[in-house]
Amino acid sequence: MTSIEPTHTGKKVIVGMSGGVDSSVSAYLLMQQGYQVEGLFMKNWEEDDNNEYCAAAEDLKDAQAVCDKLGIKLHTVNFAAEYWDNVFEYFLAEYKAGRTPNPDIMCNKEIKFKAFLEFADEILDADYIAMGHYVRRRDNSDGSTQMLRGVDGNKDQSYFLYTLSHEQVARSLFPVGELEKHQVREIAKEMGLITHDKKDSTGICFIGERKFTEFLRTYLPAQPGNIETPEGEVIGTHQGLMYHTLGQRKGLGIGGMKNSNDDPWYVVDKDLERNVLIVGQGGHHPRLMSTGMTVNQLHWVDRTGPVDGCHITVKTRYRQQDVPCTLTYTDEHTLRVVFDEPVAAVTPGQSAVFYDGEVCLGGGIIDQLIRG
């Protein structure tokens, strides 16, 4: 492998070591670039069962093994209280209100790039922090810093980082954002890092491998109600609207209906007032399609957002193809977004993230859907 000429001698970077391959290679690449690198392992959740405890202990063990191999220090910090207050309680409140939140986005905002950065600054005297996220930063000649999509389009994580401020991006380094995932694994293998073939973590960190509905039932009591067709026919019952999201197909328990065709059933709407789950047949059912949406709680990475009436692109969920759209501000905190073509399963509570080419501009929370 070609060595990288050190260019940043003396600058101190604290790398968020998760025990995975991406953070492992991030630490290695930054050392190659001449940074003074130390690791920091975050504990964000107090495990409530043996399996979760074992997984967290395994991650810490792997992070320590990588740091030992690289010859760098590994610090540990417990952010479980901050996570509970700023991420988990928000997650529960949104589900209780019938929306579908994205706790990973809130975790990045409140923990990985806020609590972590503050700890790295105040306790470890960092110049920068670094994470194993697949995004890039661009430093412009006018002194501004922008966040760009990762080179690996399949792994790009800018959707999860749109809440970062200009200042947070300027203090953060994203070495693996310049690489494809297979290159990251190759570097890890070549360097003899224990994480080179470790499976990527999936799902919400505090749920782990458990079934989502079982986990949610621990914190939110079931609220059974009817399942209806758009015409009002009752065809089943649900245990709680919070267990279902728009576009969901599995786990409805209503197959083989009389007088229905063979198309699968999808959740097409939720009637919060009546506690009714509305389902329709086919992935492009009219009730599942939106021509636009309103978006609030806006956040722009470079503080000034796109101009009124501009035509850019948006993602309404992770790994979605960009959707061309036109933006209109209804006030400084709310956008009306009209899609060029109707989009399926746009979900209130999820994030809408806007792009101008490679640049992630920022985004907000999907509030209301526009249909027809």
From Swiss-Prot:
User: Which cysteine pairs are covalently linked by disulfides here?
Assistant: 107-205
**CC annotations in GO:** cytoplasm
Question: Which Gene3D superfamilies does the record cross-reference, listed alphabetically?
Answer: Adenine nucleotide alpha hydrolases-like domains, HUPs, Translation factors
Q: Where is this region: Interaction with target base in tRNA?
A: 102-104
Top-level EC class, please? Answer: transferase
Site note Interaction with tRNA, residues: 133, 350
Q: Catalysed reaction(s)?
A: S-sulfanyl-L-cysteinyl-[protein] + uridine(34) in tRNA + AH2 + ATP = 2-thiouridine(34) in tRNA + L-cysteinyl-[protein] + A + AMP + diphosphate + H(+)
Give the residues the record marks as binding ATP.
16-23, 42, 132
GO MF, any single term: tRNA binding
| Active-site annotation | 107 (nucleophile), 205 (cysteine persulfide intermediate)
According to the lineage, what is the superkingdom?
Answer: Bacteria
Annotated localization: Cytoplasm
> Where are the annotated segments for Interaction with tRNA?
155-157, 317-318
Q: What is its main location?
A: cytoplasm
* Single GO BP term: tRNA wobble position uridine thiolation
Keywords for the protein's UniProt record, in alphabetical order: ATP-binding, Cytoplasm, Disulfide bond, Nucleotide-binding, RNA-binding, Transferase, tRNA processing, tRNA-binding
Under which EC number(s) is this enzyme classified?
2.8.1.13
The Swiss-Prot or TrEMBL record describes its family as follows: Belongs to the MnmA/TRMU family.
NCBIfam families membership: PRK00143.1, trmU
What does the protein in this record do?
Answer: Catalyzes the 2-thiolation of uridine at the wobble position (U34) of tRNA, leading to the formation of s(2)U34.
Please report the name of this protein according to its UniProt entry.
tRNA-specific 2-thiouridylase MnmA
